[in-house]
Amino acid sequence: MDPGKEGLPRKPRFSAQQLHVGKWLSPFFFTCAVYFLLWIPDDQPSWVGALVKCLPVLSLVVFLRAVDAGGGYSARLQGALLCSAVGDACLVWPEAFLHGVAAFAAAHLLYLWAFGLTPLQPGLLLLVILAALPYYGLLLWHLPPDLVLALTAYSLALATMLWRGLARGGSTGWGALLFTLSDTTLAWNAFAQPLPHARLVVMTTYYSAQVLISLSVSQSPKLKPN
């Protein structure tokens, strides 16, 4: 040991801000664990199942309110999360499927508003279109006629959100990518072909997407002091 450094205070492993963020994220991880441990069958719709499913996303609203000192970006993310929670609850009941699609479409529009159009990066848009067209072209053959219009509109909102998330980069980009993976897996499993462990893939990527997008608020200078 360097004798000249004896007695000097050690640099903390985590900053106070990181500990503050971690503290307010802990309810998200706890409620995610509850969801996966309970694993309530999705063929038995109930308000308990809906609540357990929504709690991780609602906990992220609390997280954003706790760590952000205010601003339009955080407010739009909170709005998107609340719309997502409504969508989560609706999708528990098959008869409310279109209501769930509408709620998630509203969430994507709020994410789009939050992400903005700068930098534009049209090349990324071209890549998203080239990836989306073959997938949706195949899925289209399996969709019930009465859902084609609604799911086409939803797919456009999702693809645009992916483009803007990737353009923003960082945790936002990863979150947008995982959100898209979650939704495309869900749609293929529901309408085209049953996939092994589809629900696990859908919910793991979905919760990961929401927390990654929420963490993008840490790039803002308006974080609340601890």
UniProtKB/Swiss-Prot annotation:
UniProt topology in membrane: Multi-pass membrane protein
Enzyme Commission number(s) of this protein: 3.3.2.2
Documented activity regulation: Competitively inhibited by lysophosphatidic acid.
Cytoplasmic domain ranges by topology: 1-23, 65-76, 118-123, 164-171, 218-226
Any GO CC annotation of this UniProt entry: endoplasmic reticulum membrane
Main location: endoplasmic reticulum
Catalytic activity, as annotated: a 1-O-(1Z-alkenyl)-sn-glycero-3-phosphocholine + H2O = a 2,3-saturated aldehyde + sn-glycerol 3-phosphocholine; a 1-O-(1Z-alkenyl)-sn-glycero-3-phosphoethanolamine + H2O = a 2,3-saturated aldehyde + sn-glycero-3-phosphoethanolamine
Top EC category: hydrolase
One term of GO molecular function: D-lysine 5,6-aminomutase activity
Spans within the Extracellular topological domain: 41-46, 94-99, 141-146, 189-199
Domain of life per record: Eukaryota
Locations listed in the record: Endoplasmic reticulum membrane; Cytoplasm
Residues passing through the membrane, by range: 24-40, 47-64, 77-93, 100-117, 124-140, 147-163, 172-188, 200-217
InterPro entries according to UniProt: TMEM86B-like
Keywords, sorted A to Z: Cytoplasm, Endoplasmic reticulum, Hydrolase, Lipid metabolism, Membrane, Transmembrane, Transmembrane helix
Example GO biological process: ether lipid metabolic process
Function: Catalyzes the hydrolysis of the vinyl ether bond of choline or ethanolamine lysoplasmalogens, forming fatty aldehyde and glycerophosphocholine or glycerophosphoethanolamine, respectively and is specific for the sn-2-deacylated (lyso) form of plasmalogen.
Family membership: Belongs to the TMEM86 family.
Quaternary structure annotation from Swiss-Prot or TrEMBL: Homodimer.
Name of this chain's protein: Lysoplasmalogenase TMEM86B
UniProt organism field: Sus scrofa (Pig)
Taxonomic lineage of the native organism: Eukaryota, Metazoa, Chordata, Craniata, Vertebrata
Gene behind the chain: TMEM86B
